[in-house]
A protein has these predicted regions:
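Generic N-terminal amphipathic, Lys/Arg-enriched alpha-helix
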Residues: 1-10, 28-31
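Short internal beta-strands
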Residues: 31-38, 117-119
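N-terminal beta-loop-helix "entrance" segment that forms/cooperates
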Residues: 36-53
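Short acidic low-complexity segments
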Residues: 54-63
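Conserved phosphate/oxyanion-binding catalytic-loop motifs
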Residues: 70-76
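Ser/Thr/Gly-rich flexible loops in soluble cytosolic domains mediating phosphotransfer, phosphorylation
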Residues: 84-113, 117
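Conserved small/polar residues in nucleotide/adenosyl-binding loops
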Residues: 128-129
Length: 129
């Protein structure tokens, strides 16, 4: 049997970027709250919470004085609007590749084009489209 070991392992670029941003902000003394778990990795989420990050289910539950971290898969425009209404500072950790897909979807909508997205509509990565 021939065993081939992967050259790399770990998070994808977008998730790694979001995790690093959050750890850096916490290390600099910022009060941060993520909208839902930052990533789908309970050990990392627990470590972030142990360092002071809050995991909030929505913008309304973010305490005053906390900075919001937008997760790597992004959020719908309505969430940005809620953050603005509450005048909360935020850090957008949306993966650039995901943001590109969001722009394509918005352009399709503006042009009244039919946009088909396959998968579970309630899944957080697809529900923003």
């Amino acid at each position: 049997m021939n065993i081939i070991r992967a050259k790399t392992a770990g998070f994808c670029f977008g998730v790694d970027r979001a995790v690093k941003l959050t750890y850096d902000l916490l290390a600099d003394g910022h009060k941060v709250a993520t909208l839902g778990p930052l990533i789908h990795n309970p050990q990392v989420v627990e470590d972030l919470e142990a360092k002071g990050a809050l995991t909030c289910p929505n913008v309304a539950s973010v305490p005053d004085g906390y900075e919001v971290i937008i997760r790597s898969h992004g959020v719908p425009q309505t969430v940005y609007d809620e953050i603005s209404t509450r005048r909360l500072a935020y850090h957008d950790a949306t993966c650039p590749f995901v943001a590109k897909i969001h722009k394509i979807a918005m352009r399709a909508d503006e042009n009244h084009a039919l946009l088909l997205v396959a998968g579970d509509a309630s899944q957080d990565r697809k529900s923003v489209v």
